[in-house]
Amino acid sequence: RGYAGRVAGGVFKPGDEVTVLPSGFSTRVKAIHSPDGELSEAFAPQSVCLTLTDEIDISRGDTLVKANNPPMVNQNIEAMICWFSPRPMLRSTKWIVRHTMRETQAIIKEVKYHVDINTLHKIEGVDDFHMNDIGRITLRTAVPLIYDSYRRNRTTGSLILIDPHTHETVAAGMIV
C-alpha cells in the first residue's frame, strides 16, 4: 500500500525511519515512487507515493516526519498575521484555521501587538484587527497542529484564517 503526498521539507530515502503524526507510529520507508517511476530519494516540493515497511493507518492530513527531525506539535500557536477582511476581527469568533492539508477551529487567544508599518514599532494594548493590520497573535486550536516556524519551513510554517460563516479568507499568518 502506498501513501501519496507532497514533500514539504527535507529528504526522504528508502530505509529512512519515519514517524506518523499525530499517531506517533514509526516505520521505515520501503520505496519511493513518482509518475516517472521509482526514485532513490524525494525532496521538496515533489509529489510522491511512499510505500512503508509496516501496514499502519495513515489518514488525510497526517504528517510523515523523519524520526530525528520532529516538528512542533501544539494547540497554542504564535503567528504574525495580516488581516485581509474589511470586517474587523471579533475575538469571540471561532475561526477556521487551514494549515497544510488540515482544517480545524481556533480562537484568537491573545493579540500580542500590532506593527506600525511606517515605523515598524510594536503597538501594544490593541485588541482587534482591521483591514491591512499586521501583528502578532496567539491562536488556540481545537486539535494540535504539526508545524515548524515559517523561518524554518514556509509550507508547514504558514496558515490562513477563514471566516466560518462566509468562508472568506480573513488573514494569512506566518508561525513564529
Question: What are these model-predicted stretches?
Answer:
Residues 2-176:
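C-terminal effector/interaction modules appended to NTPase cores
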